[in-house]
Amino acid sequence: MTWSVFTLTYIYLSILISQPQQHPNEYIRGATLRFLQKIAKDAELLEPLIPTCRSCLEHRHSYVRKNAVFAVYSIYREFEHLIPDAPELMYTFLIAETDSTCKRNAFVFLAHCSMQKAVEYVVSIYDTIPSLDEALQMSIIEVIRLDCKNDSTHRVRGISSTCILSSLMII
């Protein structure tokens, strides 16, 4: 069996990219994940990096988790088959996450990739929406608006919460 130069280059690039993703320095991990977003156009290059990218969602630093969410989003947007359980993964991440920026990014991911999961999350946290971060509230308002355009079972609840949140934002 002979290896082409092109195949060896892919293997070498995968190794070079996966090493910084496992680096102990959180900035290097985050920067590598940001780079991964930019090259999320080649499935062969991304495939060996998926497990490391998923593990970065559980990193102790929010900078790494935030960039891991973006990387998963970029990969899922281009190649759904590489991370078929990404909406469920983001939903469980969203429930467990404490950092407001990471929560907002994961929620935006759900809003773009699985509106049903985004609405499910909004319904599950409905009573605590006024106490959430403003950026997450704005994203929730957008999801409620989009959900109300459809014939949704949550339409009345969505309209009332949009009015409440809109009045909170004006003050």
Regions inferred by a protein language model and the residue ranges of each:
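Extended alpha-solenoid helical-repeat scaffolds
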Residues: 1-171
